[in-house]
Structures are given as structure tokens and as C-alpha cells.
């Protein structure tokens, strides 16, 4: 038995260059005033920003192989992008389209001309897709059974709380057919959608209903189950990088604010009690970075030991998710009264952190997964 390779947690020059490019675009096109304006409008997503990121920077096709029209990058590069998107709470469908839906499609038969063409359109930014599962779906939950397919590929059923479905033109739908599990391509126009009230207004959800919607079978049987599981594992592992970027922004912004704010005749950040809180938070964020980078590295090495992938993803989510929430809560509190206002962007980060906490498996769900390999009894 060979020992697992030591993970490379450092960023490469290519990853640093990618970060700089994404950060420059977000600084120019995704300021907090613009994000607040978006969520107050009828169209919370920013289509112009997405076109710039997806087509001009090629981010929509990061995970798509070059032979299918993508960039042929890995989960490590996608993780860097998600760090920056999380740090800006950018209202774009990268997680839903470029990660979840794309990874599910890559687990299907990419030699099929129609599937290859769809991946090419997604990679070019010409189309957007969403994986039709609840955002709370976690790796290892089993194949969903809320949608049924008949022998002709027509789908009937409902899926609630689907991320990035409102902006998608194509839905990748898990459904149970006459021969068992299957993944189906369905035009978004074939589904009735409603937008429920969601905590995170920068990533609105959709409730979808299918009534004999025409679908094309992408994968069936074990292939469909494996493709869905891989998509959820990849999504959960890379979500940790979004949460990391969010936590880093909260820490940096709070340090900056406390270094400027004066009270009682001195800079607020000079008080020892606040220094200790920020130092503790810094340690949490540094540890979260290690967990998120490890998950991205293991995912980038896929196919590797499935148990190693599951372990790295569960560890990242179990640790990083609470850190992101704590960082956002500390940012709100340490900003004082201004942190409670709508005009200050810190509430966007708290809402995203709380929404991400239940996305793709709660921390408790992932801790239970971690308990299995070390034979810990389940919590009472």
C-alpha cells in the first residue's frame, strides 16, 4: 500500500496570474454598490459580468477538456476563481453552471455528439446550465427520486431550491426511469419555475416542476449515479474555496476598519481584546485555506482513491463552512452600527456564509461522514 502524496497547498504562478485577472475584472465590474443594486432589481444575476468572465476570460470552460472546447484546467484553478468570486459575492452562476452541471455532463458519454456540443457551448459561454438538485443535496445522499421519466424520456415531478436555475437555458435532471436512475438534458423552458424567498439574494434559488417535459437521456444506471455523485463531490469540495474567499474578505475588511476607526481617543484596533479576536480568526482562516486547498488538490488528481476524495471534501466542508460563518458574524459585530446597515456590504457576506453552510451538505452531515473511517459512534 502506497502512502498518499503530500498535498501541494501553495499557489502556482499560473494560479496567481488567474487570480489577478479575475480580481481585476471583479474590482472593475462587481463593486459592492453594483451587487446591492443587482439584488434590489428583478434580475439579481449580472449577465454582462458573466459574459465577460465566461467568454473573454474562459472561466465557464475551466473544467472542460480542450478537445471539447474548454480550457482543460483542473479543480485547483476553479478553486482560485471561486475564492475571488466568494470574496466579491459575485452574482454569477459559476458554481451552478461551470462546476455542478459541467461536472455532471463530463461524467456522461462525452463521445456523444450532442453531449459534446452542449459542453462546447457551455465552455464558450454561449449557454448556461444548472444541475436540478436541491442546493442542500450532499455527496452520498443517494440518487433523488422526486422526478420520474417514462419510456419516451418525458419527465414529471418537482425539485425545490435549485441554485442558478433561473439563469440557465439547460437543466441536467436526475430522474428515475423504467430502467432505473438516469440523467436527462431538459430545456429550461420545459420546466415551470418559481422563485422562493431565499436568504442569499446574490444566489437566488428556483423551485422547478416538470409536467411531461421532453428530456434526452445523457447517462443511465450506474453511470448516472456516478456522474451525479462526482458532481456533488466536486461542488462541495470547491464550495469550500468560495467560503474561504468570503472569510478572507471579512477578515481583511474588519482589520482595515478597526485600524481606522477611532473611539475613546485611540484606534479601536489597538484594544487587546479585539486584537485577540482577530488573531484567533486569522488562525481559523489560515487553517481553512489548508483544508480548502487540500480538497481542490485531491479533486484535481481525480481519478484517485474514492475514499481519499470523499475524506478531503468532507474535511474541507466540516471545517471551512463554520469558519466562514464565524468570520462573517465577527465582521458584522466588529463593524458596530454601520455593520447593521443595508448600505454596508457585510450583510451580503453573512447571508452568503449562512446559505453556503447548508449547501451541498451541512457541516454536521460532513462530520458524520468523517466519523465513519475512524469508527466514531454517531452522535446521540
List each model region and its residues.
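Amphipathic alpha-helical segments in well-structured domains
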Residues: 74-78, 98, 115
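Generic beta-strand or strand-like secondary-structure segments
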Residues: 80, 84, 100-107, 117, ...
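FAD-binding core of flavoproteins
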Residues: 3, 116-248, 252
Amino acid at each position: 500500500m502506497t502512502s498518499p502524496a503530500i498535498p501541494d497547498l501553495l499557489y502556482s504562478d499560473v494560479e496567481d496570474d488567474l487570480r489577478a485577472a479575475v480580481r481585476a475584472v471583479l474590482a472593475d465590474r462587481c463593486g459592492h454598490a453594483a451587487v446591492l443594486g443587482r439584488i434590489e432589481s428583478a434580475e439579481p444575476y449580472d449577465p454582462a459580468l458573466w459574459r465577460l468572465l465566461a467568454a473573454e476570460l474562459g472561466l465557464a470552460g475551466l473544467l472542460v477538456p480542450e478537445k471539447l472546447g474548454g480550457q482543460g484546467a483542473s479543480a485547483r484553478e476553479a478553486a482560485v476563481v471561486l475564492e475571488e468570486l466568494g470574496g466579491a459575492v459575485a452574482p454569477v452562476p459559476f458554481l451552478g453552471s461551470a462546476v455542478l452541471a459541467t461536472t455532471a455532463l463530463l461524467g456522461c458519454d462525452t463521445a456523444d455528439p450532442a453531449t459534446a456540443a452542449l459542453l462546447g457551448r457551455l465552455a464558450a459561454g454561449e449557454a448556461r446550465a444548472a444541475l436540478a438538485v436541491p442546493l442542500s443535496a450532499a455527496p452520498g445522499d443517494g440518487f433523488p427520486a422526486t422526478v420520474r421519466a417514462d419510456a419516451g424520456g418525458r419527465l414529471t415531478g418537482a425539485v425545490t431550491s435549485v441554485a442558478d436555475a433561473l439563469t440557465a437555458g439547460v437543466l441536467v435532471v436526475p430522474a428515475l426511469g423504467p430502467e432505473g436512475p438516469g440523467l436527462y438534458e431538459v430545456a429550461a423552458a420545459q420546466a415551470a419555475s418559481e422563485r422562493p424567498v431565499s436568504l442569499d439574494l446574490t444566489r437566488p434559488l428556483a423551485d422547478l416542476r416538470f409536467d411531461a417535459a421532453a428530456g434526452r437521456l445523457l447517462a443511465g444506471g450506474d453511470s448516472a449515479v456516478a456522474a451525479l455523485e462526482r458532481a456533488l463531490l466536486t461542488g462541495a469540495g470547491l464550495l469550500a474555496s468560495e467560503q474561504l474567499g468570503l472569510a478572507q474578505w471579512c477578515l481583511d475588511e474588519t482589520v482595515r476598519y478597526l485600524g481606522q476607526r477611532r473611539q475613546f481617543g485611540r484606534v479601536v484596533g489597538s484594544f487587546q481584546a479585539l486584537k485577540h479576536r482577530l488573531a484567533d480568526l486569522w488562525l481559523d482562516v489560515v487553517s481553512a485555506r489548508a483544508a480548502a486547498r487540500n480538497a481542490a488538490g485531491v479533486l484535481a488528481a481525480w481519478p484517485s482513491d474514492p475514499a481519499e476524495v470523499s475524506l478531503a471534501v468532507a474535511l474541507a466542508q466540516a471545517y471551512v463552512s463554520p469558519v466562514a460563518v464565524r468570520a462573517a458574524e465577527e465582521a458584522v459585530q466588529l463593524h458596530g452600527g454601520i455593520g447593521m446597515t443595508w448600505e454596508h456590504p457585510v450583510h451580503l457576506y453573512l447571508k452568503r456564509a449562512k446559505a453556503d453552510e447548508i449547501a451541498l451538505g451541512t457541516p454536521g452531515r460532513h462530520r458524520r461522514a468523517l466519523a465513519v473511517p475512524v469508527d466514531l459512534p454517531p452522535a446521540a
